[in-house]
Amino acid sequence: GNDPKVRLAMANASLMAGVAFSNSMVGVVHGLGHATGAVAHIPHGLAMSIFLPHGLKYNLKKRKDLIGQLLLPLAGEDFYLNTPKEERAQKTIEKAIEMKKAMNDACGLPGTLKEAKVDYDQLENIANTALGDGTLLVNPEALEFSDAMKLLDDAYENY
C-alpha cells in the first residue's frame, strides 16, 4: 500500500522474521512452499502463509510442547496461563489460523491454494517436487508422498 507507517511496519516484521529464520531450520512448510512456487508460480511468502497451519498440524505429534509454547507470544500471558498445557499446541494452531485469516482479509490475500488459483491437477506434481526438497531433511516428521498429498489437499480448500 501507500501508507508509510504500514510499509515501515511490514519492513520491520520482515526484518524480525529474517533474524528468527536465520537461526532455525526449515521443514515441511518450506518444502511444500518451494515446490508450489516452482510448479504453480505463486510467491514464496504467500505459499509459506498458506502452508504454515498445515505444517504445524503435521508436526504436532513430535513437537507438541514447542508448538504449545508459541501460544504465549501469539495470544498473551492471560490466555496462555488459562489454557491447560495439553491444549496449548492446538490453541496455538487455532490462533495462527485466526491471525492468518485477519491478515488475509486486511490485505486481500488468498488463504488457500484454491484461492491462490493453484490448479488442483498440479498437486501431484507439487507433492513429487516437494519430496526432493532438502528442507524436508530437518523436518521432525518424515514426509511421504501420501502425506504430502494430504497436506496439499487440505491446504487446497482449508486455512
Question: What is each stretch, according to the model?
Answer:
Residues 1-98:
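Active-site segments that bind and position negatively charged phosphate/pyrophosphate groups
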